[in-house]
Amino acid sequence: MKNQFIKTTSLIVLFFSVFISCTSDSESDLSTDTDVDDVVITELHAAYAEFNTDATDIYLSNGGTTVTIETTGLPNHESVYWGEDSDLYLEESEVATTPSIMSSNNNAVTITVDATPNLTGSTVSTQLNTIGVAVSGASIFNDQEGNGALDEAAASLDWTGAHIGPGVYHYHLEPKAFTNDDKNLVGILLDGVFLYGRKCNSTDTYPTDLDTSGGHTSVTQHSDGIEEYHYHIINELYSTTGSYIAFTGPYQGY
């Protein structure tokens, strides 16, 4: 009877040892499987060649897992917001200008984005202030003005859908200075996804398969024949502006 008890006890101990060992292995495997390493790249995406080199400095960072964009924030196109002393000043009498003019002191922005956007995570809403950098070097903002709708400030937007505030020149609408009902590159957003004009390079017309963020996967003029996820300015007029919101969100690349 005593030997039987010892055998039974030994079997129970062995069972729990095996159970604990298997449970530990499973948890270790799960942890390993859910770890996603950052993708390392050695060359900048071809689209970055479109950016205004007088305003931007773009380089790989964090060992090639991210891209850093430093910009003066000063665009290479005309606007009333340059001020009359600038060669790029454009008289726009119909624009209810904000008090500021462009200055290198307050437009400078530095952003760091993933070199390869993570499209497997959750969507993230855009916030106020800079949500991306345009090819001109200026900032891109979303469809909000302060905590209200853009309608309240629409009269202050220049011919290319931009104005200054708070102290930063930025686009809210389709920036007609470099994209106007076409497939041109607009810029890069904070999630590392490129933003293009209203038309798609692969079809030369308005895409019909966009998600809620204005994104889809197709070949672009910068992807060397490979399909990649990117955003478009959605071809829907905004309010009474007669133009189109640059990007509302949410981000898909976080």
Segments (PLM) and residue ranges:
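Bacterial Sec-dependent N-terminal signal peptides
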Residues: 17-44
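A motif-centric signal for short, conserved binding hotspots located
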Residues: 40-169, 173-254
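Sec-dependent bacterial lipoprotein signal peptides
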Residues: 1-20
